[in-house]
Amino acid sequence: ILAYEILKDMGMNLEDRTEVMMAIGNHDEATGTAVSDISAALILADKSDVHRNRVRNRDIVTFDKHDKVNYAVTKTDFIMDREKRKVTLDITIDNTICPVLDYFDIFMERTKMSKYAAKYLNIWLN
C-alpha cells in the first residue's frame, strides 16, 4: 500500500502502478513467483541483493545468521550479458566471518526463485 501511494504521488499511471504492485506482491520466497517481466526482474534484483552494507548493526557479537552472511559478503556483482541472455551473480564471501555453507543455507530458496524468474525471462542464470 505504501509503494502504491508513493508511485501515485509520483504521477505513475494506474496500469503501471498495478503492474509494480503485482510484482512486489509476488516476490516473497514463500508464496511468490514470476508472473510478468517486471516481477521476474524484481525477483532477480531482490534475491541477489546480499552485501555487507545491508547490515546496519555493526556489533558482530549480536549478529543473527542473516547479518553474518550479509556482513561476510564483501563484493557482489550482478552481470547481465544481453547477447548471450545470461545473468551472472559473482559474490565474494569472507569465510573468516561465516562459512560459505551458511550463505547457501539462507539463500538456496532465493536462488531457486531467481532461477525460475530467469527462466520466465528466457535468460540463463549463471
Model-derived segments and spans:
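Terminal helices and disordered tails flanking the catalytic cores of nucleotide-processing hydrolases
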Residues: 52-126
